[in-house]
Amino acid sequence: HPRRRLDDAERVIGEHPGLNTYQIAGMMQWKIRAKDWDDFPPGQKYFAMSETLAHLEHLLLEGRIQKEQAGDEAPVYLIK
């Protein structure tokens, strides 16, 4: 499961470079009964974003992605 999530986050970043954590989480595959990210209950979005952020940090430590931040903007992620 953790490896699948890491691969899924990396896939999203590869297909859509320059997204922030919220946007990446919204494009990942989740097993929840919601038709799309907008339909996720707020609590589930919070947990999904927390999990996504942990996976992004792991991918950063592995050197598979990079993080960029401009000023006060939310950081965005790119494939290395």
Residue ranges and their predicted role:
Residues 1-14:
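Long, low-complexity, charged/polar intrinsically disordered regions in eukaryotic proteins
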Residues 11-80:
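C-terminal regulatory/interaction regions
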